[in-house]
UniProtKB/Swiss-Prot annotation:
Domain MGS-like: residue ranges: 1-145
Xref: PANTHER family: BIFUNCTIONAL PURINE BIOSYNTHESIS PROTEIN ATIC, BIFUNCTIONAL PURINE BIOSYNTHESIS PROTEIN PURH
One GO term of the biological process aspect: 'de novo' IMP biosynthetic process
Alphabetized NCBIfam families for the sequence: PRK00881.1, purH
Domain of life of the organism encoding this protein: Bacteria
InterPro entries: AICAR_Tfase_dup_dom_sf (IPR024051), Cytidine_deaminase-like (IPR016193), MGS-like_dom (IPR011607), MGS-like_dom_sf (IPR036914), PurH-like (IPR002695)
Lineage: Bacteria, Pseudomonadati, Spirochaetota, Spirochaetia, Brachyspirales
Record has Metal-binding as a keyword: no
Keyword set includes Hydrolase: yes
This protein's encoding gene: purH
Organism: Brachyspira hyodysenteriae (strain ATCC 49526 / WA1)
Pfam families reported for this sequence: AICARFT_IMPCHas (PF01808), MGS (PF02142)
Protein name: Bifunctional purine biosynthesis protein PurH
Length: 509
Protein backbone atom coordinates (compact mmCIF):
# COMPACT_ATOMS: atom_id res chain seq x y z
CA UNK A 1 0.00 0.00 0.00
CA UNK A 2 1.29 3.43 -0.95
CA UNK A 3 1.44 5.73 2.08
CA UNK A 4 4.20 8.20 1.20
CA UNK A 5 5.35 9.59 -2.16
CA UNK A 6 8.36 11.73 -3.05
CA UNK A 7 7.84 14.14 -5.94
CA UNK A 8 10.66 16.10 -7.60
CA UNK A 9 9.95 17.10 -11.19
CA UNK A 10 11.39 19.60 -13.65
CA UNK A 11 8.49 19.12 -16.08
CA UNK A 12 5.27 19.97 -14.23
CA UNK A 13 2.86 18.66 -16.90
CA UNK A 14 0.13 16.60 -15.27
CA UNK A 15 1.73 16.57 -11.83
CA UNK A 16 -0.88 18.77 -10.18
CA UNK A 17 -3.77 16.47 -11.09
CA UNK A 18 -1.77 13.40 -10.11
CA UNK A 19 -0.79 14.94 -6.77
CA UNK A 20 -4.46 15.75 -6.09
CA UNK A 21 -5.30 12.12 -6.84
CA UNK A 22 -2.61 10.90 -4.42
CA UNK A 23 -3.94 13.22 -1.73
CA UNK A 24 -7.43 11.81 -2.27
CA UNK A 25 -5.95 8.36 -1.58
CA UNK A 26 -4.44 9.64 1.70
CA UNK A 27 -0.88 9.47 0.33
CA UNK A 28 1.52 11.81 2.13
CA UNK A 29 3.64 13.86 -0.29
CA UNK A 30 7.26 14.90 0.24
CA UNK A 31 8.80 17.29 -2.27
CA UNK A 32 11.84 19.40 -3.14
CA UNK A 33 12.62 22.97 -4.18
CA UNK A 34 10.54 24.24 -7.08
CA UNK A 35 8.18 21.28 -7.00
CA UNK A 36 7.43 21.84 -3.32
CA UNK A 37 6.69 25.51 -4.00
CA UNK A 38 4.48 24.67 -7.00
CA UNK A 39 2.40 22.12 -5.07
CA UNK A 40 2.13 24.41 -2.04
CA UNK A 41 0.91 27.32 -4.17
CA UNK A 42 -1.79 25.05 -5.57
CA UNK A 43 -2.99 24.00 -2.13
CA UNK A 44 -1.60 20.46 -2.21
CA UNK A 45 -0.61 19.24 1.27
CA UNK A 46 3.14 18.70 1.01
CA UNK A 47 6.17 18.23 3.28
CA UNK A 48 9.46 19.87 2.29
CA UNK A 49 12.29 17.37 1.95
CA UNK A 50 14.45 19.29 4.43
CA UNK A 51 11.88 18.47 7.12
CA UNK A 52 12.50 14.78 6.44
CA UNK A 53 16.30 14.94 6.23
CA UNK A 54 16.83 17.59 8.90
CA UNK A 55 19.24 19.31 6.51
CA UNK A 56 18.67 22.32 4.28
CA UNK A 57 19.53 22.33 0.59
CA UNK A 58 23.16 23.29 -0.01
CA UNK A 59 25.65 24.18 -2.76
CA UNK A 60 23.09 26.14 -4.80
CA UNK A 61 20.70 23.20 -4.77
CA UNK A 62 23.26 20.62 -5.85
CA UNK A 63 22.57 18.65 -2.65
CA UNK A 64 18.92 18.16 -1.75
CA UNK A 65 17.98 14.49 -1.63
CA UNK A 66 21.41 12.84 -1.34
CA UNK A 67 20.71 11.74 2.21
CA UNK A 68 20.36 8.37 4.04
CA UNK A 69 16.91 9.38 5.27
CA UNK A 70 15.75 9.56 1.66
CA UNK A 71 17.59 6.62 0.17
CA UNK A 72 17.13 4.46 3.25
CA UNK A 73 13.40 5.14 2.97
CA UNK A 74 13.45 4.00 -0.67
CA UNK A 75 15.92 1.10 -0.56
CA UNK A 76 14.71 -0.69 2.57
CA UNK A 77 13.32 -4.12 1.64
CA UNK A 78 9.90 -4.28 3.26
CA UNK A 79 9.92 -8.03 3.97
CA UNK A 80 13.43 -7.91 5.45
CA UNK A 81 13.00 -7.51 9.24
CA UNK A 82 16.56 -6.24 9.69
CA UNK A 83 16.05 -3.49 7.11
CA UNK A 84 12.77 -2.41 8.65
CA UNK A 85 14.18 -2.43 12.17
CA UNK A 86 17.16 -0.35 11.03
CA UNK A 87 15.09 2.42 9.45
CA UNK A 88 12.74 2.39 12.44
CA UNK A 89 15.68 2.90 14.81
CA UNK A 90 16.83 5.86 12.71
CA UNK A 91 13.39 7.42 12.53
CA UNK A 92 13.02 6.86 8.78
CA UNK A 93 9.54 6.55 7.26
CA UNK A 94 9.43 4.34 4.11
CA UNK A 95 8.82 6.04 0.76
CA UNK A 96 6.51 3.91 -1.40
CA UNK A 97 6.40 6.00 -4.56
CA UNK A 98 9.03 8.13 -6.31
CA UNK A 99 8.05 10.56 -9.06
CA UNK A 100 11.05 12.22 -10.68
CA UNK A 101 11.92 13.66 -14.06
CA UNK A 102 15.32 15.07 -14.82
CA UNK A 103 16.96 18.39 -15.58
CA UNK A 104 16.70 19.06 -19.35
CA UNK A 105 20.26 18.08 -20.24
CA UNK A 106 19.11 16.49 -23.51
CA UNK A 107 17.81 19.87 -24.68
CA UNK A 108 20.47 22.11 -23.17
CA UNK A 109 23.44 20.16 -24.54
CA UNK A 110 22.27 21.13 -28.05
CA UNK A 111 21.93 24.83 -27.21
CA UNK A 112 24.77 26.62 -29.00
CA UNK A 113 24.17 29.73 -26.90
CA UNK A 114 25.24 27.98 -23.69
CA UNK A 115 28.86 27.69 -22.60
CA UNK A 116 30.40 24.40 -21.49
CA UNK A 117 30.23 25.42 -17.82
CA UNK A 118 26.55 26.34 -18.15
CA UNK A 119 25.69 23.00 -19.72
CA UNK A 120 27.43 21.19 -16.85
CA UNK A 121 24.89 22.69 -14.44
CA UNK A 122 22.10 20.83 -16.24
CA UNK A 123 23.60 17.45 -15.39
CA UNK A 124 21.18 16.00 -12.83
CA UNK A 125 22.72 14.06 -9.94
CA UNK A 126 20.06 13.68 -7.27
CA UNK A 127 17.27 12.86 -9.72
CA UNK A 128 18.91 9.83 -11.37
CA UNK A 129 20.10 8.63 -7.96
CA UNK A 130 16.56 8.62 -6.55
CA UNK A 131 15.20 6.99 -9.69
CA UNK A 132 17.80 4.23 -9.61
CA UNK A 133 17.22 3.56 -5.92
CA UNK A 134 13.47 3.32 -6.50
CA UNK A 135 13.87 1.16 -9.60
CA UNK A 136 16.11 -1.26 -7.71
CA UNK A 137 13.39 -1.48 -5.05
CA UNK A 138 10.59 -1.85 -7.60
CA UNK A 139 8.91 -4.66 -5.64
CA UNK A 140 8.18 -2.20 -2.84
CA UNK A 141 8.36 1.19 -4.57
CA UNK A 142 6.38 2.49 -7.54
CA UNK A 143 8.67 4.69 -9.62
CA UNK A 144 7.47 7.10 -12.30
CA UNK A 145 9.99 8.78 -14.61
CA UNK A 146 7.67 9.54 -17.55
CA UNK A 147 4.70 11.92 -17.32
CA UNK A 148 2.82 9.65 -19.72
CA UNK A 149 2.66 6.99 -16.98
CA UNK A 150 0.58 8.99 -14.51
CA UNK A 151 -2.65 7.67 -16.00
CA UNK A 152 -1.39 4.07 -16.00
CA UNK A 153 -0.53 4.18 -12.30
CA UNK A 154 -3.71 6.06 -11.43
CA UNK A 155 -5.91 3.48 -13.16
CA UNK A 156 -4.25 0.58 -11.32
CA UNK A 157 -4.39 2.35 -7.96
CA UNK A 158 -8.10 2.94 -8.47
CA UNK A 159 -8.55 -0.81 -8.94
CA UNK A 160 -6.60 -1.61 -5.79
CA UNK A 161 -2.82 -1.59 -6.22
CA UNK A 162 -0.12 -1.25 -8.85
CA UNK A 163 0.70 -4.69 -10.23
CA UNK A 164 4.11 -6.33 -9.97
CA UNK A 165 4.37 -6.40 -13.78
CA UNK A 166 3.64 -2.69 -14.05
CA UNK A 167 6.15 -1.86 -11.31
CA UNK A 168 8.81 -3.87 -13.13
CA UNK A 169 7.93 -2.14 -16.40
CA UNK A 170 8.23 1.29 -14.77
CA UNK A 171 11.59 0.28 -13.28
CA UNK A 172 12.84 -0.80 -16.70
CA UNK A 173 11.89 2.64 -18.05
CA UNK A 174 13.99 4.24 -15.32
CA UNK A 175 17.16 2.35 -16.23
CA UNK A 176 16.43 3.00 -19.90
CA UNK A 177 16.21 6.72 -19.15
CA UNK A 178 19.22 6.96 -16.85
CA UNK A 179 21.45 4.98 -19.21
CA UNK A 180 20.47 7.28 -22.08
CA UNK A 181 20.99 10.32 -19.87
CA UNK A 182 24.45 9.17 -18.78
CA UNK A 183 25.31 8.28 -22.38
CA UNK A 184 24.43 11.81 -23.44
CA UNK A 185 26.60 13.27 -20.67
CA UNK A 186 29.50 10.98 -21.58
CA UNK A 187 29.23 11.88 -25.26
CA UNK A 188 29.10 15.59 -24.41
CA UNK A 189 32.17 15.39 -22.17
CA UNK A 190 34.19 13.31 -24.64
CA UNK A 191 33.31 15.53 -27.60
CA UNK A 192 34.38 18.61 -25.64
CA UNK A 193 37.98 17.35 -25.34
CA UNK A 194 40.48 19.58 -27.09
CA UNK A 195 42.10 16.50 -28.62
CA UNK A 196 40.71 12.98 -28.96
CA UNK A 197 43.93 11.59 -30.40
CA UNK A 198 44.88 8.29 -28.74
CA UNK A 199 41.74 8.50 -26.57
CA UNK A 200 39.05 5.83 -26.69
CA UNK A 201 36.06 5.13 -24.49
CA UNK A 202 35.65 1.50 -23.43
CA UNK A 203 31.92 1.43 -24.08
CA UNK A 204 29.79 2.73 -26.92
CA UNK A 205 26.85 4.41 -25.21
CA UNK A 206 24.70 6.43 -27.56
CA UNK A 207 21.58 8.24 -26.46
CA UNK A 208 18.55 8.08 -28.77
CA UNK A 209 14.92 8.88 -27.93
CA UNK A 210 11.85 7.32 -29.51
CA UNK A 211 10.46 9.70 -32.12
CA UNK A 212 7.65 7.55 -33.44
CA UNK A 213 6.43 4.04 -34.08
CA UNK A 214 6.52 3.30 -37.81
CA UNK A 215 3.85 1.31 -39.64
CA UNK A 216 6.45 -1.34 -40.48
CA UNK A 217 10.08 -1.83 -41.46
CA UNK A 218 11.55 -2.55 -44.88
CA UNK A 219 8.67 -5.00 -45.39
CA UNK A 220 5.15 -5.17 -43.92
CA UNK A 221 5.95 -8.17 -41.72
CA UNK A 222 8.79 -6.29 -39.94
CA UNK A 223 8.10 -4.07 -36.93
CA UNK A 224 9.94 -0.73 -36.85
CA UNK A 225 10.49 2.42 -34.80
CA UNK A 226 12.35 5.68 -35.38
CA UNK A 227 14.72 7.05 -32.74
CA UNK A 228 16.56 10.37 -32.85
CA UNK A 229 19.73 11.53 -31.15
CA UNK A 230 19.33 13.34 -27.83
CA UNK A 231 22.68 15.11 -28.23
CA UNK A 232 23.28 15.79 -31.93
CA UNK A 233 21.52 17.91 -34.48
CA UNK A 234 20.82 16.39 -37.88
CA UNK A 235 18.76 16.76 -41.03
CA UNK A 236 16.73 13.62 -40.31
CA UNK A 237 15.92 14.76 -36.78
CA UNK A 238 14.38 18.20 -37.06
CA UNK A 239 12.79 18.28 -40.52
CA UNK A 240 9.25 19.56 -41.00
CA UNK A 241 6.62 17.61 -42.95
CA UNK A 242 4.38 20.02 -44.86
CA UNK A 243 2.17 17.54 -46.71
CA UNK A 244 1.44 13.90 -47.35
CA UNK A 245 1.14 10.56 -45.62
CA UNK A 246 3.21 9.48 -42.64
CA UNK A 247 6.81 8.57 -43.36
CA UNK A 248 7.87 4.94 -43.62
CA UNK A 249 11.10 3.19 -42.65
CA UNK A 250 12.22 3.11 -46.31
CA UNK A 251 11.20 6.74 -46.83
CA UNK A 252 13.49 7.95 -44.05
CA UNK A 253 16.46 5.88 -45.25
CA UNK A 254 16.08 7.05 -48.85
CA UNK A 255 15.47 10.65 -47.84
CA UNK A 256 18.71 10.65 -45.83
CA UNK A 257 20.78 9.50 -48.82
CA UNK A 258 19.05 11.83 -51.27
CA UNK A 259 19.70 14.83 -49.05
CA UNK A 260 23.32 13.92 -48.36
CA UNK A 261 24.03 13.92 -52.10
CA UNK A 262 22.66 17.41 -52.74
CA UNK A 263 24.33 18.80 -49.61
CA UNK A 264 27.68 17.90 -51.17
CA UNK A 265 27.09 21.03 -53.27
CA UNK A 266 27.04 24.68 -52.21
CA UNK A 267 23.90 26.62 -53.07
CA UNK A 268 25.65 29.89 -52.15
CA UNK A 269 27.97 29.26 -55.12
CA UNK A 270 24.87 28.75 -57.31
CA UNK A 271 25.43 24.99 -57.34
CA UNK A 272 21.72 24.19 -57.56
CA UNK A 273 21.64 20.44 -56.96
CA UNK A 274 18.98 17.78 -57.31
CA UNK A 275 19.13 14.04 -56.67
CA UNK A 276 16.75 11.12 -57.12
CA UNK A 277 16.87 7.97 -54.99
CA UNK A 278 15.18 4.60 -55.37
CA UNK A 279 15.73 1.75 -52.89
CA UNK A 280 18.66 3.59 -51.24
CA UNK A 281 20.38 3.87 -54.63
CA UNK A 282 20.91 7.04 -56.70
CA UNK A 283 19.09 6.90 -60.03
CA UNK A 284 19.87 10.47 -61.00
CA UNK A 285 21.70 13.60 -59.89
CA UNK A 286 22.49 16.88 -61.56
CA UNK A 287 23.47 20.51 -61.18
CA UNK A 288 21.63 23.29 -62.96
CA UNK A 289 21.63 27.05 -63.37
CA UNK A 290 18.27 27.04 -61.60
CA UNK A 291 16.26 24.68 -59.39
CA UNK A 292 14.02 23.81 -62.32
CA UNK A 293 16.96 23.01 -64.58
CA UNK A 294 18.57 20.87 -61.87
CA UNK A 295 15.36 18.83 -61.57
CA UNK A 296 14.81 18.48 -65.32
CA UNK A 297 18.38 17.28 -65.78
CA UNK A 298 18.02 14.82 -62.89
CA UNK A 299 14.81 13.47 -64.42
CA UNK A 300 16.59 13.07 -67.75
CA UNK A 301 19.26 10.87 -66.10
CA UNK A 302 16.72 8.04 -65.69
CA UNK A 303 13.08 8.90 -66.47
CA UNK A 304 12.00 5.33 -65.69
CA UNK A 305 13.60 4.68 -62.30
CA UNK A 306 12.67 8.05 -60.80
CA UNK A 307 9.01 6.97 -60.79
CA UNK A 308 8.04 6.32 -57.16
CA UNK A 309 11.34 7.72 -55.91
CA UNK A 310 12.56 10.44 -53.57
CA UNK A 311 13.75 13.77 -54.98
CA UNK A 312 15.95 16.16 -52.98
CA UNK A 313 17.09 19.75 -53.51
CA UNK A 314 19.70 21.87 -51.72
CA UNK A 315 17.69 25.04 -52.37
CA UNK A 316 14.16 26.45 -52.38
CA UNK A 317 11.64 24.85 -54.74
CA UNK A 318 9.68 27.36 -56.80
CA UNK A 319 6.29 27.09 -58.51
CA UNK A 320 7.69 26.17 -61.93
CA UNK A 321 9.65 23.26 -60.44
CA UNK A 322 6.65 22.12 -58.41
CA UNK A 323 4.53 21.94 -61.56
CA UNK A 324 7.09 19.59 -63.09
CA UNK A 325 7.37 17.47 -59.95
CA UNK A 326 3.66 16.64 -59.84
CA UNK A 327 3.69 15.30 -63.40
CA UNK A 328 5.03 11.96 -62.11
CA UNK A 329 4.43 9.83 -59.04
CA UNK A 330 6.97 10.59 -56.32
CA UNK A 331 7.07 9.41 -52.72
CA UNK A 332 8.87 12.44 -51.29
CA UNK A 333 10.17 15.86 -52.23
CA UNK A 334 12.64 17.25 -49.69
CA UNK A 335 14.15 20.71 -50.00
CA UNK A 336 15.60 23.63 -48.09
CA UNK A 337 12.26 25.40 -48.48
CA UNK A 338 9.27 25.85 -50.76
CA UNK A 339 7.71 29.07 -52.01
CA UNK A 340 4.04 29.47 -51.00
CA UNK A 341 3.05 28.99 -54.64
CA UNK A 342 5.14 25.81 -54.95
CA UNK A 343 3.64 24.39 -51.77
CA UNK A 344 0.14 25.06 -53.04
CA UNK A 345 0.92 23.13 -56.22
CA UNK A 346 2.52 20.20 -54.39
CA UNK A 347 -0.42 19.94 -51.99
CA UNK A 348 -2.67 19.04 -54.91
CA UNK A 349 -1.03 15.62 -54.53
CA UNK A 350 -2.44 14.77 -51.09
CA UNK A 351 -0.24 11.71 -50.58
CA UNK A 352 3.01 13.35 -51.70
CA UNK A 353 5.26 13.81 -48.70
CA UNK A 354 6.69 17.32 -48.79
CA UNK A 355 9.60 17.77 -46.40
CA UNK A 356 11.49 20.92 -45.42
CA UNK A 357 14.89 20.19 -43.89
CA UNK A 358 16.27 22.60 -41.31
CA UNK A 359 19.76 21.29 -40.57
CA UNK A 360 22.53 20.25 -42.92
CA UNK A 361 23.74 16.68 -42.60
CA UNK A 362 25.78 16.30 -39.44
CA UNK A 363 26.83 12.64 -39.31
CA UNK A 364 30.32 12.12 -37.92
CA UNK A 365 30.24 8.35 -37.46
CA UNK A 366 28.66 5.47 -39.33
CA UNK A 367 27.21 2.43 -37.56
CA UNK A 368 26.53 -1.03 -38.97
CA UNK A 369 24.74 -3.63 -36.86
CA UNK A 370 26.04 -7.20 -37.15
CA UNK A 371 24.91 -10.27 -35.26
CA UNK A 372 26.10 -9.72 -31.70
CA UNK A 373 28.07 -6.57 -32.45
CA UNK A 374 28.27 -3.11 -33.91
CA UNK A 375 30.79 -1.84 -36.45
CA UNK A 376 31.71 1.81 -35.97
CA UNK A 377 33.60 3.94 -38.48
CA UNK A 378 34.11 7.59 -39.36
CA UNK A 379 31.61 8.92 -41.87
CA UNK A 380 33.03 9.06 -45.42
CA UNK A 381 33.43 12.81 -45.81
CA UNK A 382 36.86 13.02 -47.48
CA UNK A 383 36.73 13.47 -51.24
CA UNK A 384 40.04 14.54 -52.75
CA UNK A 385 43.04 15.58 -50.70
CA UNK A 386 45.80 15.50 -53.28
CA UNK A 387 44.92 14.13 -56.71
CA UNK A 388 47.45 13.10 -59.32
CA UNK A 389 47.15 13.04 -63.11
CA UNK A 390 48.80 9.74 -64.07
CA UNK A 391 48.35 9.83 -67.87
CA UNK A 392 49.95 11.68 -70.74
CA UNK A 393 46.70 13.49 -71.41
CA UNK A 394 45.43 15.93 -68.80
CA UNK A 395 41.74 16.66 -68.19
CA UNK A 396 40.43 20.06 -69.23
CA UNK A 397 39.17 22.42 -66.53
CA UNK A 398 35.56 21.57 -67.41
CA UNK A 399 36.27 17.84 -67.38
CA UNK A 400 37.91 18.21 -63.97
CA UNK A 401 34.81 19.91 -62.55
CA UNK A 402 32.65 17.11 -63.92
CA UNK A 403 34.97 14.49 -62.44
CA UNK A 404 34.65 16.05 -58.99
CA UNK A 405 30.88 16.13 -59.42
CA UNK A 406 31.03 12.43 -60.27
CA UNK A 407 33.04 11.53 -57.16
CA UNK A 408 30.48 13.32 -54.99
CA UNK A 409 27.73 11.15 -56.48
CA UNK A 410 29.48 7.78 -56.80
CA UNK A 411 30.33 7.66 -53.08
CA UNK A 412 26.60 7.20 -52.36
CA UNK A 413 26.11 4.31 -54.80
CA UNK A 414 26.52 0.71 -53.63
CA UNK A 415 29.85 -0.87 -54.58
CA UNK A 416 31.02 -1.77 -57.09
CA UNK A 417 29.94 1.62 -58.39
CA UNK A 418 30.61 3.61 -61.55
CA UNK A 419 29.05 6.92 -62.62
CA UNK A 420 29.21 8.34 -66.14
CA UNK A 421 28.87 12.13 -66.23
CA UNK A 422 28.03 14.64 -68.92
CA UNK A 423 27.53 18.35 -68.26
CA UNK A 424 27.09 17.79 -64.51
CA UNK A 425 24.51 15.06 -65.00
CA UNK A 426 24.92 11.52 -63.63
CA UNK A 427 23.71 10.06 -66.90
CA UNK A 428 24.66 6.49 -66.10
CA UNK A 429 24.93 4.91 -62.65
CA UNK A 430 26.11 1.33 -62.36
CA UNK A 431 26.02 0.07 -58.78
CA UNK A 432 25.77 -2.98 -56.57
CA UNK A 433 27.69 -5.20 -59.00
CA UNK A 434 30.04 -7.94 -57.86
CA UNK A 435 32.69 -6.95 -60.37
CA UNK A 436 33.76 -3.58 -61.68
CA UNK A 437 33.41 -4.26 -65.39
CA UNK A 438 29.71 -5.08 -64.95
CA UNK A 439 29.21 -1.81 -63.07
CA UNK A 440 31.09 0.01 -65.83
CA UNK A 441 29.15 -1.59 -68.67
CA UNK A 442 25.87 -0.94 -66.86
CA UNK A 443 26.70 2.75 -66.38
CA UNK A 444 27.93 3.19 -69.96
CA UNK A 445 24.87 1.51 -71.46
CA UNK A 446 22.52 3.58 -69.33
CA UNK A 447 24.31 6.81 -70.19
CA UNK A 448 24.42 6.18 -73.92
CA UNK A 449 27.01 8.90 -74.15
CA UNK A 450 29.08 10.78 -71.64
CA UNK A 451 32.23 12.76 -71.18
CA UNK A 452 33.86 11.54 -67.98
CA UNK A 453 33.60 8.64 -65.57
CA UNK A 454 34.02 8.26 -61.79
CA UNK A 455 34.73 5.01 -59.96
CA UNK A 456 34.41 4.34 -56.22
CA UNK A 457 37.46 2.04 -56.21
CA UNK A 458 40.49 1.07 -58.30
CA UNK A 459 40.47 -0.96 -61.52
CA UNK A 460 41.82 -4.49 -61.05
CA UNK A 461 42.24 -4.84 -64.84
CA UNK A 462 42.40 -2.60 -67.91
CA UNK A 463 39.01 -3.83 -69.14
CA UNK A 464 37.17 -0.84 -67.64
CA UNK A 465 39.35 1.59 -69.60
CA UNK A 466 38.86 -0.38 -72.82
CA UNK A 467 35.08 -0.28 -72.30
CA UNK A 468 35.23 3.48 -71.71
CA UNK A 469 37.10 3.98 -74.96
CA UNK A 470 34.23 2.37 -76.91
CA UNK A 471 31.90 5.05 -75.51
CA UNK A 472 34.29 7.93 -76.15
CA UNK A 473 34.93 8.72 -72.47
CA UNK A 474 37.47 11.55 -72.25
CA UNK A 475 38.57 11.37 -68.60
CA UNK A 476 38.41 8.99 -65.63
CA UNK A 477 38.73 9.58 -61.90
CA UNK A 478 39.44 6.71 -59.50
CA UNK A 479 41.41 6.06 -56.28
CA UNK A 480 44.24 4.03 -57.79
CA UNK A 481 46.08 1.45 -55.73
CA UNK A 482 45.75 -1.69 -57.83
CA UNK A 483 48.76 -3.91 -58.49
CA UNK A 484 47.82 -3.49 -62.17
CA UNK A 485 47.48 0.30 -62.12
CA UNK A 486 50.11 0.59 -64.84
CA UNK A 487 48.03 -1.58 -67.19
CA UNK A 488 45.10 0.83 -66.81
CA UNK A 489 47.40 3.83 -67.26
CA UNK A 490 48.84 2.29 -70.43
CA UNK A 491 45.33 1.61 -71.73
CA UNK A 492 44.36 5.24 -71.12
CA UNK A 493 47.44 6.44 -73.00
CA UNK A 494 46.61 4.11 -75.90
CA UNK A 495 43.06 5.47 -76.11
CA UNK A 496 43.88 9.11 -75.40
CA UNK A 497 41.97 9.18 -72.10
CA UNK A 498 43.00 11.32 -69.14
CA UNK A 499 43.03 9.58 -65.76
CA UNK A 500 43.31 10.93 -62.24
CA UNK A 501 44.16 9.07 -59.04
CA UNK A 502 42.69 10.51 -55.84
CA UNK A 503 44.13 8.06 -53.32
CA UNK A 504 40.70 7.98 -51.61
CA UNK A 505 38.45 4.92 -51.94
CA UNK A 506 34.67 5.16 -51.50
CA UNK A 507 33.38 1.62 -50.94
CA UNK A 508 29.76 1.49 -49.82
CA UNK A 509 28.40 -1.87 -48.71
Amino acid sequence: MIKRALISVFYKDGILDFAKFLTSKNVEIVSTGGTYKYLKENNIPVIEVSEVTGAKEMLDGRVKTLDPKIHGAILAIRDNPTHMETIKERGITPIDMVIVNLYPFFEKVQDDNLKFEEKIEFIDIGGPTMLRSAAKSFKDVVVISDVKDYDLVKSEMEKGEVSFETKKYLASKVFNLTSAYDAAVSEFMFNSLESKEDKKLNYLNMSYALQEELRYGENPHQGASYYVSTTDKGSMKDFEQLNGKELSFNNIRDMDIALKIVLEFDESKKEYACSAIKHSTPCGAALGSSVLEAYNRTYECDPTSIFGGIVAFNSTVDEATAKELIKIFLEIVIAKDFTPEALEVLKTKKNLRVIKYKTNTNDKINLVKVDGGLLVQDEDTTLIEDYKVVTEKKPTEEEMKNLIFGIKVVKYAKSNAIVVIKDFMAKGIGSGQTNRIWACEDALERAGDGVVMASDAFFPFRDVVDACAKYNIKAIIQPGGSMRDQESIDACNEHGIAMIFTGIRHFKH
